[in-house]
């Protein structure tokens, strides 16, 4: 992170509370950071794993108290921003084949990343973008839209653009509902 009130100053110095934070993610492989999300904790998504910086009692993260913990070893797809939904974080797996929900587990005192598209992964074809529309009343859940790529030939073939196919997921965690469908447009 940068120095307080100096957003482009990432130079580490005396490790004062308002100094920049420099942390190395200790893993057995090189992992490029794909996204950051601030929620219950600071979540760090990489190509090979997910990490989090725990934040106890709403104390700010500083150079003297920063700790990075490993959450899961799934990896997230580059270019698709994770979405916050009902206390969890939805993200696409690094291969673009599974929609996962990163959720804190009180039993494990860490995050788990469950595959919520297990029964409908065939609807996700080369995902290009994701967007979430939160539910607006008590009779509907959150709606996650995943824009698929151009190629529908073969099993998840690589593509270069958008052909008009969208995978839609209605999510309602309290009722344990994940309802998936597809929308087709003219492109």
What do these predicted ranges mean?
Residues 1-21, 51-63:
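Beta-propeller domains
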Residues 24-187:
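Beta-sheet-dominated scaffold domains
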């Amino acid at each position: 992170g940068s120095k307080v009130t100096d957003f482009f100053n990432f130079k580490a110095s005396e490790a004062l509370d308002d100094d920049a934070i420099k942390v190395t993610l200790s893993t057995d492989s090189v992992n490029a950071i794909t996204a950051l999300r601030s929620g219950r904790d600071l979540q760090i998504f990489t190509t090979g794993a997910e990490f989090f910086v725990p934040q106890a009692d709403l104390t700010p993260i500083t150079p003297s108290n920063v700790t990075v913990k490993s959450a899961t070893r799934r990896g997230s797809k580059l270019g698709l921003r994770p979405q916050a939904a009902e206390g969890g974080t939805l993200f696409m797996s690094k291969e673009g084949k599974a929609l996962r929900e990163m959720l804190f587990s009180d039993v494990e005192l860490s995050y788990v990343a469950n595959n919520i598209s297990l029964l409908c992964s065939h609807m996700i074809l080369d995902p290009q973008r994701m967007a979430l529309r939160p539910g607006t009343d008590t009779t509907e859940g959150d709606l996650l839209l995943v824009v698929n790529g151009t190629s529908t030939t073969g099993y998840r073939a690589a593509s270069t653009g958008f052909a008009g196919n969208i995978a839609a997921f209605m999510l309602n965690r309290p009722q344990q509902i994940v309802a998936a469908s597809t929308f087709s447009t003219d492109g």
